[in-house]
């Protein structure tokens, strides 16, 4: 009995220690509809300001942001995607916990004036080697 319990404890410890090595990054993809009067440059400008503010927040220092504009595709009901990548779900959680009332939330309101990004999905992302 002790031998079996010891094996389970060792296996559990190894899994706990190995988990961070195999954990993926947190990726939030927003599907956005751009207002007809807004330009891609305006979207980029506000997204850049938002990312700068977000990087100053707890959990946001290593956030990466991407704008994806289609070249040749049937995108359905969205004009572009705003992609945010955090190095871990722990960092993403700290960032979202601090979001309410933050400078990034204030800039988010400016973004709402030129685009509607109400649909999103959270992904776990792994780099393929």
Q: What residues fall within each predicted segment?
A:
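Short S/T/G/P-rich N-terminal loop/turn motif that feeds into the first structured element of a domain
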Residues: 14-102, 114-129
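Bacterial N-terminal signal peptides that target proteins for export
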Residues: 1-10
């Amino acid at each position: 009995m002790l031998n079996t319990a010891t094996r389970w404890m060792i296996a559990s410890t190894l899994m706990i220690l190995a988990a961070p090595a195999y954990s993926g990054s947190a990726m939030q993809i927003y599907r956005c509809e751009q207002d007809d009067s807004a330009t891609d440059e305006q979207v980029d400008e506000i997204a850049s300001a938002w990312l700068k503010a977000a990087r100053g927040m707890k959990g946001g220092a290593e956030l990466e942001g991407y704008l994806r504009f289609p070249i040749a595709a049937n995108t359905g009901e969205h004009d572009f995607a705003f992609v945010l990548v955090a190095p871990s779900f722990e960092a993403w959680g700290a960032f979202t916990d601090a979001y309410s009332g933050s400078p990034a939330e204030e800039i988010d309101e400016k973004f709402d004036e030129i685009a509607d990004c109400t649909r999103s999905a959270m992904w776990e992302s792994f780099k393929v080697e």
